[in-house]
Amino acid sequence: MRRRRTLTRQTEGSALVEFAIALPLLVVFLVGIYDFSGAFNQKQKIGHAAQEAAVIAGAQPMTDMDPAAPATANPYSLQPVLEVVFSSLSADNVLPQGTWASCAVAHNHLSELKWSFTITGCTPDSLVIAIDRGWVTSVGGPPTTVGTQVTVSYPYHWRFNSVIQLLVPGAIYAATTNISETATVHNQM
């Protein structure tokens, strides 16, 4: 009994024990701050690319777009939009420094004036760009305006998953989150 009281009153080594407990928490907080700021930064860059693409798409002519065209139709006027997104994300270091020429672009004609493009081969993940040239908005009735809506989606790979294992071994945390941003503009042509 006396020995137990003596052990609980001793303070030698308590700083080392506190440090051993606090260090994993500190590492998790630091990596969490770094990782969440990286995700937010990537979201801003994707939003910027979507806005640039919407401006370019809204200024493109619609003469090569036929709502009655077959599902295999791929309007040439949308190609600059894809290149703008790729160039913007490459310049912002969201995409690896690949070249547009090495990309494989699969398109899907969703409806009359809506297309979805999946870019693979030049990035480790799939970059998805959805373009709606017939986006209609009405605020409380007529008059309505017709614009272009561009949605850009690209995954973010979290680093937090490997660090959370320090505190909770076996914890499952999503390793990838798909970040998507949408931008709209009024059609100029």
Language-model segment annotations:
Residues R2-A91:
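Alpha-helical assembly-interface signal, strongest on the long, hydrophobic N-terminal helix that forms
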Residues T11, T144-T145, N178:
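A generic fold-level signal
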Residues G13-S14, G32, T118-V128, S153-S162:
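Short linear motifs at secondary-structure transitions and domain/linker junctions
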Residues V55-T151:
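Short amphipathic secondary-structure patches
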Residues D64, S153-M189:
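Low-complexity, S/T/G/P-rich flexible repeat/linker segments used as non-globular hinges
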